């Protein structure tokens, strides 16, 4: 019997599946998942983890050992398998002058759930494999339409929703990456000014692995009436991860983070949210609750959570922000 089938009942990680025998996923507790680390070395220090984690995220070396070393080992096997398939296909086609395109990992999940921390931790771990792969990290924030466009289209209150992104630009970027093109530009975003930075780009030059992180990366698109092929962002992924948590927990993390930002980033006069630094705690709490209820909760329910079943791996967090359950798609 596999470890996955030893779990009593099915976790709430995928509550729409009634039995693991009918689920496309294997389920593991964090303790069971930790055993898959095997002899994977810990290549991060405690200080490095503190530097990589986002505000309010308590991830530490113990969490890296429990969850991320096993995940690093799993991803290593996928990357190696991808390389083997690439070599076999080249032999089949009698091609010898072809360079393998980047292995792309997509990371999705709600605002405030910890996607950025996961992405940064993975970037460091993967880059320290014995093979020393080149790993780049890009977020979808830079692919938001500029505020001027959102204001003109009356979409500022829909920022983060699918229509607020330049999906065409995302698809062109990923197409160029998967085509193996050099020096591909990714637009930059500033959380300080809450806007895309004009004429500022990050250059992605043929990495071995690209981590692409954002709330919308697993979303599907409606098929056009004319029947033309419409690519989805996830079509370019070799592996995808969804960071999951109970709705109430994400709500609490979002509000807590907002209140902490009032004491830090919002105090910068250049901050888009500087006006919130001088209001009372009660007023700030009311604003945070309103932003959660009318924007982020709606986006989670309508657009983000429905994409969860499309992920290859689901990491379910508990109330302490630490991962409690893992679901891995069956092959």
Swiss-Prot record:
InterPro entries: P-loop_NTPase, PanK, PRK/URK. The keyword Transferase applies. The keyword Lipoprotein does not apply. It comes from the Bacteria. Keywords: ATP-binding, Coenzyme A biosynthesis, Cytoplasm, Kinase, Nucleotide-binding, Transferase. One of its GO terms (cellular component) is cytoplasm. ATP binds at residues 109-116. It is an enzyme of class 2 (transferase). Its main location: cytoplasm. GO terms for biological process: coenzyme A biosynthetic process. Pathway: Cofactor biosynthesis; coenzyme A biosynthesis; CoA from (R)-pantothenate: step 1/5. It holds the Pfam family PRK. It catalyses: (R)-pantothenate + ATP = (R)-4'-phosphopantothenate + ADP + H(+). CDD domains: PanK. GO terms for molecular function: ATP binding; pantothenate kinase activity. It is found in: Cytoplasm. Its EC number is 2.7.1.33. Belongs to the prokaryotic pantothenate kinase family. This is Pantothenate kinase. It comes from Rhizobium etli (strain ATCC 51251 / DSM 11541 / JCM 21823 / NBRC 15573 / CFN 42). The lineage of its organism: Bacteria, Pseudomonadati, Pseudomonadota, Alphaproteobacteria, Hyphomicrobiales.
